[in-house]
């Protein structure tokens, strides 16, 4: 029998083992599509970003104009920019759904895969933040000022750290140039981390909705899941292009159509929608250092999730009480997102504080408690 190049060639063999002949559980649902969708998001963002970088000038006097020039004078520049800006939103939608899936189905018990995933999330958040500064509009400038300023809350070294990050005594040209350098670099770091993430995943194989070992009933990834993924691509790229073509500025802030002006502060400084939940938690504590710690904890708490798993069952498929708690957490995050977009006044302050408290309570206290309770219920 002639040797199969796909299985013998050193490079093709790797692709084959991870995308073609990969043994996959036969019962994974559409919730397992988001990993590949994130891959498509990353590819799209790198391609559109590369094309934008060719026309962008990282200088405070030219940045805003260079973005306007791209949209007005470059062939399909407006489309490239709209796809890139809204592609970021879809990236976050996919990653949040992907994390939610992992949480619901107990995928976090693959600890290495989960932890590399959290590092990927943090890198993505950093990339989105530095990218938002590049158009050098009002919200770009003031967002950069407010968020980088948070580091000054770190005792003793805080102020020095912030001035070192800024490259001066305020957000200015050095800040913009280094943010552009970082925004160019980080997506490639994300691509590298993704390979590590997949390496760890393929050590154990995919989890499945029942949370049981599926080795006895696995099917090849291609053609089954390659086809299913292609449908997922179409279902994501369709709303992305629709948004980019019909209402590209729907998720943006009108303030960013005004060039950055250090002398005029916008009435409401707020980040893009995908950071609002964390922003609400930051603002809910009336102390700078406390707020910064809560902000960090809101994402870093994900590292603790595997340690807080007390149930005898892996997934929530057959755990109605945990399901109820899970959807309460989703509702809670929705409330936090809404609060983050509101001004700091009554009743939003108290709602934000209660929602922040509830967020940490559900994750740190209620989930382990309910898991233990469900174990006891299994015995009766």
From Swiss-Prot:
GO cellular component terms given for this protein: mitochondrial inner membrane; respiratory chain complex III
Main location: mitochondrion
Membrane-traversing stretches: 34-54, 78-99, 114-134, 179-199, 227-247, 289-309, 321-341, 348-368
GO BP term, example: mitochondrial electron transport, ubiquinol to cytochrome c
Keyword field contains Electron transport: yes
Binding-site list for heme b b562: 84, 183
MF annotations from Gene Ontology: metal ion binding; ubiquinol-cytochrome-c reductase activity
Swiss-Prot/TrEMBL cofactor(s): heme b
Residues given in the record as heme b b566 binding sites: 98, 197
Residues the entry annotates as binding a ubiquinone: 202
Bilayer disposition of the protein: Multi-pass membrane protein
Keyword field: Electron transport, Heme, Iron, Membrane, Metal-binding, Mitochondrion, Mitochondrion inner membrane, Respiratory chain, Transmembrane, Transmembrane helix, Transport, Ubiquinone
Free-text comment on the cofactor: Binds 2 heme b groups non-covalently.
Aminoacyl-tRNA synthetase is among the record's keywords: no
Subcellular location as annotated: Mitochondrion inner membrane
One Pfam family from the record: Cytochrom_B_C
InterPro entries, A to Z: Cyt_b/b6_C, Cyt_b/b6_C_sf, Cyt_b/b6_N, Cytb/b6-like_sf, Cytochrome_b, Cytochrome_b_C_euk/bac, Cytochrome_b_N_euk/bac, Di-haem_cyt_TM
Further remarks about this protein from its record: Heme 1 (or BL or b562) is low-potential and absorbs at about 562 nm, and heme 2 (or BH or b566) is high-potential and absorbs at about 566 nm.
PANTHER family according to UniProt: CYTOCHROME B
Oligomer status and interactors: The cytochrome bc1 complex contains 11 subunits: 3 respiratory subunits (MT-CYB, CYC1 and UQCRFS1), 2 core proteins (UQCRC1 and UQCRC2) and 6 low-molecular weight proteins (UQCRH/QCR6, UQCRB/QCR7, UQCRQ/QCR8, UQCR10/QCR9, UQCR11/QCR10 and a cleavage product of UQCRFS1). This cytochrome bc1 complex then forms a dimer.
Physiological role: Component of the ubiquinol-cytochrome c reductase complex (complex III or cytochrome b-c1 complex) that is part of the mitochondrial respiratory chain. The b-c1 complex mediates electron transfer from ubiquinol to cytochrome c. Contributes to the generation of a proton gradient across the mitochondrial membrane that is then used for ATP synthesis.
Family: Belongs to the cytochrome b family.
Protein name: Cytochrome b
Species, as recorded: Aptenodytes patagonicus (King penguin)
Gene encoding the protein: MT-CYB
């Amino acid at each position: 029998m002639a040797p199969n190049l796909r299985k013998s060639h050193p490079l093709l063999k790797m692709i084959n083992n991870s995308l073609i002949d990969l043994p996959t559980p036969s019962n994974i649902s559409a919730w397992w599509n988001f990993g590949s969708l994130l891959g498509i998001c990353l590819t799209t963002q790198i391609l559109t970003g590369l094309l934008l970088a060719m026309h962008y000038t990282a200088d405070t006097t030219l940045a805003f104009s260079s973005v306007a020039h791209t949209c007005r004078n470059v062939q399909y520049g407006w489309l490239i920019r709209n796809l890139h800006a809204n592609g970021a939103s879809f990236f976050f939608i996919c990653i949040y759904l992907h994390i939610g899936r992992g949480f619901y189905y107990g995928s976090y018990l693959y600890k290495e895969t989960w932890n590399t995933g959290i590092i990927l999330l943090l890198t993505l958040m950093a990339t989105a933040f530095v990218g938002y500064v590049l158009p050098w509009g009002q919200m770009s400038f003031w967002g950069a000022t407010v968020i980088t300023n948070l580091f000054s809350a770190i005792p003793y070294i805080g102020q020095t750290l912030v001035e070192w990050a800024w490259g001066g005594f305020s957000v200015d040209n050095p800040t913009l140039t280094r943010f552009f350098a970082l925004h160019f670099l980080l997506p490639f770091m994300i691509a590298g981390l993704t390979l590590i993430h997949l390496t760890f995943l393929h050590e154990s194989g995919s989890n499945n909705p029942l949370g049981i070992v599926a080795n006895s009933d696995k099917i090849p990834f291609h053609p089954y899941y390659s086809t299913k993924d292609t449908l997922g691509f179409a279902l994501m790229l369709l709303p992305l292009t629709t948004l980019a073509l019909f209402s590209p500025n729907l998720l943006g802030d009108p303030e960013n159509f005004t060039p950055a002006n250090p002398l005029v502060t916008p009435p409401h400084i707020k980040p893009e929608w995908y950071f609002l939940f964390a922003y609400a938690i930051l603002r809910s504590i009336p102390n700078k250092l406390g707020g910064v710690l809560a902000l960090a904890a809101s994402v870093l708490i994900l590292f603790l999730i595997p340690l807080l798993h007390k149930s005898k069952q892996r997934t929530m498929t057959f755990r109605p009480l945990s399901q109820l708690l899970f959807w309460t957490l989703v509702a809670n995050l929705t409330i936090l997102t809404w609060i983050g977009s509101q001004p700091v006044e009554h009743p939003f302050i108290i709602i934000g504080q209660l929602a922040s408290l509830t967020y940490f309570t559900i994750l740190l206290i209620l989930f382990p408690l309910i898991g233990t309770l469900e174990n006891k219920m299994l015995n009766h």
